[in-house]
């Protein structure tokens, strides 16, 4: 039973890869399936597969079954563009993806020009929807809303402290750092240090020495978990006792694997955990019975499929432009994230960001819990 949970949708995906003649509605899954951010790609893949299996069992999109095809963008904009062009060439008309803002923004132009609707489960940079392309939607929140929470938290709790704001120079990481800095400054607190590092960097000893010399007692990180985990661990190794705060880019259990016990007390912002919603209890159990923990963006990807299918059925059409119109005009749509409506830009109606703290759970493992 555990192995066969999503076998139907996996079989459909294999059919699509081998030849598209059997496909009804082709939906592309664009995500980092390999590389340092593959954990997020796996969350998106699992969420999409589970939602498509459910949708197909209920009749699919206007009576047509959904077939999945996969594109590994490896969190790289250039590879993402190659994936987008491949999807277009294969006849894909709907995409769940991409994850990284730096990938979603350039690929959205390709999709828009070729009649492809995309729903991004993890793209939080405001620019993605601010351009108001007809085809861009997201099921996650925006960084201009996210930055308000840590900015206010640091202004309230470290008014006389020394704050360092670090980022990974990406549209997501630097964008989030800038939004956080903006709110912090608005509330009268000036950061002591603002600095970028490179994605993939491993040795942060020089940076941490700089933080120590500046007397920093709180570090805000705009970026993802691979670098965050190393910074947290190396801060502890070098004796820097500072509160580490970040955003939704570190919500992976891999953070604890990288940082070790030093992850204790780390704070991050994210939306309320949909695993704790009683309405999702059966679905959470299915994932866990299949050996997968549906953390972070799993449910955001699942909700993307639900929004797509519900909008198509409401429109009575599988034409991407007609579905896009329905997404903006015929909501709210019932999803695992709650009822979602989309505004004219493609942004969803979701509850605000909240703060989480990393600590040991009842199972003795480190995880993030809402404060």
UniProtKB/Swiss-Prot annotation:
Per the UniProt entry, the signal peptide is 1-23
What is this protein for, i.e. what is its function?
Component of an amino-acid transport system.
Organism equals Brucella abortus (strain 2308)
Pfam families (UniProt xref): Peripla_BP_6
Q: Which domain of life is it from?
A: Bacteria
- What's this protein's family per the entry? Belongs to the leucine-binding protein family.
Entry-linked CDD domains: PBP1_ABC_LIVBP-like
Name of this protein:
Leu/Ile/Val-binding protein homolog 2
Q: Which residues span the membrane?
A: none
Keywords linked to the UniProt accession: Amino-acid transport, Signal, Transport
A GO BP entry is:
amino acid transport
């Amino acid at each position: 039973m555990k192995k066969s949970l999503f076998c139907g949708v996996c079989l459909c995906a294999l059919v699509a890869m081998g030849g598209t003649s059997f496909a009804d509605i082709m939906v592309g899954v664009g995500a980092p399936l390999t590389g340092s951010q593959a954990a997020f790609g796996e969350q998106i893949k699992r969420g999409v597969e589970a939602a498509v299996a459910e949708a197909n069992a209920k009749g699919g999109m206007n009576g047509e079954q959904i077939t999945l095809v996969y594109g590994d963008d490896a969190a790289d904009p250039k590879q993402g563009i190659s994936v987008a062009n491949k999807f277009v060439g294969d006849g894909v008309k709907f995409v769940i993806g991409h994850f990284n803002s730096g990938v979603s923004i350039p690929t959205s132009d390709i999709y828009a020009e070729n009649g492809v609707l995309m729903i991004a489960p993890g793209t939080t940079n405001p620019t993605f929807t601010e351009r108001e392309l007809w085809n861009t939607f997201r099921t996650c929140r925006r960084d201009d809303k996210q930055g308000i929470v840590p900015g206010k938290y640091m202004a309230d709790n470290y008014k006389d402290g020394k704050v360092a704001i670090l980022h990974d120079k990406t549209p997501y990481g630097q964008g989030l750092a800038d939004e956080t800095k903006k709110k912090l400054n608005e509330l009268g607190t000036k950061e002591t240090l603002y600095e970028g590092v490179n994605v993939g960097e491993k040795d942060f000893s020089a940076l941490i020495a700089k933080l120590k010399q500046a007397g920093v007692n709180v570090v805000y990180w705009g970026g993802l978990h691979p670098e965050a985990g190393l910074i947290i661990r190396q801060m502890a190794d070098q004796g820097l006792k500072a509160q580490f705060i970040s955003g939704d880019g570190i919500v992976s259990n891999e953070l604890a694997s990288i940082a070790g016990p030093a992850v204790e007390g780390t704070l991050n912002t994210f939306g309320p955990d949909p695993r704790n919603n009683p309405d999702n209890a059966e679905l959470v159990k299915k994932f866990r019975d299949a050996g997968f923990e549906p953390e972070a963006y799993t449910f955001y990807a699942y909700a993307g499929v639900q929004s797509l299918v519900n909008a198509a059925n409401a429109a009575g059409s599988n034409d991407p432009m007609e579905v896009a119109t329905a997404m903006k005009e015929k909501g709210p749509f019932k999803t695992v994230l709650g009822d979602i409506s989309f505004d004219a830009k493609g942004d969803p109606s979701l509850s605000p960001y909240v703060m989480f703290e990393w600590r040991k759970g009842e199972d003795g493992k480190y995880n993030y819990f809402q404060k």
